Amino acid sequence: MADADVHRHARAAYDNLGRTAIESAVLAVRGPAAIRDYMPIEGRAHLDAALAGGTGVLIISGHMANWELAGATIAAHGYPADGVVRHMGNPIFERWLTRVRAASGMR
């Protein structure tokens, strides 16, 4: 890979990290109300129809962008949201992120 491409990819990764950090900090302070209007659920009728069957819904997402915000958005719109996550290497960050998840309505 050319040096310019490496630099471009590294810059994009840090740009995404910064955006994710800001979104998580806002969520930690303001809670679900901060994202209800900011993050609407497209295709909500499909989600409601699937949940009407009474068996629950499994939403699978790739490991891209702010996946924490995706779960928080579901919870902010009144749906129960559970996440499957791995433990972080930093226990201080893990405790903080666990509190952010709980404050957003995720379990």
Language-model-derived ranges and their functions:
Residues M1-L58, A65-N66:
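Membrane-proximal helical "anchor" segments flanking the first transmembrane region
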Residues A12, G53-R107:
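Catalytic core of membrane glycerolipid acyltransferases/transacylases, capturing the structured
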